[in-house]
């Protein structure tokens, strides 16, 4: 998580929770002149388009006042979806036994991309079973992690 993403998470968590939703996480993606702020929300009853629109209005109001982003960007609010991103230790705990795809910031064993089943989370380290071998990754070294849906 970048410094800006951390700042945005701290700024936006309270309004999202006040609206009755969980802020699963967010991503700020810079792509030339087309940057995007993606906010993932969840609710015990699921997420509708109306829920996303409501949170978008709430978040937009905060962003307009605080103005933390210095470039032009698009705001996207959505559910985490089938390939749910994992941002926090609690997310890994919640999905123990599920298959995950992980991209590391710094390679471990000459690899940055890993797929396996979440075994456990201990503080800031997640254990993942990869091809019959348990691998351990520091959450601070995980650039991106997503559940792999089963059909």
Curated annotation (Swiss-Prot):
HAMAP family: RimP (MF_01077)
Highest taxon of source: Bacteria
Pfam family, one: RimP_N
Protein name from the UniProt record: Ribosome maturation factor RimP
Record keywords: Cytoplasm, Ribosome biogenesis
GO BP terms, alphabetized: ribosomal small subunit assembly; translation
Annotated family: Belongs to the RimP family.
Species the sequence originates in: Vibrio cholerae serotype O1 (strain ATCC 39315 / El Tor Inaba N16961)
